[in-house]
Regions:
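Glycine-rich phosphate-binding loops that contact phosphosugars or nucleotide phosphates
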Residues: 1-109
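Internal, active-site/partner-interface "lid" segment
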Residues: 66, 80-81, 106-136
Length: 136
């Protein structure tokens, strides 16, 4: 798409990887409970750097929400496992939400199909954008 996005793990972030984050960036923190010590600390470090932070969580009142710029509280009735504890359905909700956000950001940035074609020449999508078929 032409949209710069990176994955930053909480543990590696505080051991040197914070250098990839600048003041112009937006960091989306994903935390089901919002109270994990390393996530709260990362949010505090990002705030000190002047980086815009958003929290996506399933917990209305949490420590991380007190430190970030914006919070989006999501709802989930059940994780889908027999004990309702494994991050199963919540990770799917995150994926759907983040994919939708990426599409909307691309739209607002004015990314065109030609831009997408240039930035995604490989695989089935690249072939389709060139009007080719891989398998018949």
């Amino acid at each position: 798409m032409g949209l710069d996005a990176r994955f930053l793990h909480t543990n590696t972030a505080v051991h040197g990887d914070l250098g990839i984050v600048g003041k112009q960036d937006l960091v989306l923190l994903l935390s089901k409970g919002g109270n994990t010590v390393e996530t709260v600390l990362l949010a505090q470090y990002l705030r000190e750097r002047g980086t815009l932070t958003w929290l996506l969580t399933f917990t209305e009142y949490c420590k991380c929400a007190e430190v970030v710029d914006e919070s989006l509280i999501l709802h989930l009735d059940n994780e889908g496992d027999e004990w309702d504890i494994m991050p199963n359905n919540s990770t799917s909700v995150y994926l759907i939400l983040l994919q939708g956000l990426a599409v909307e950001i691309g739209r607002r940035m004015g990314i065109t199909l030609d831009d997408f074609r240039i930035n995604h020449p490989g695989g089935g999508i690249g072939a389709k954008l060139r009007g080719e078929t891989i398998w018949k």
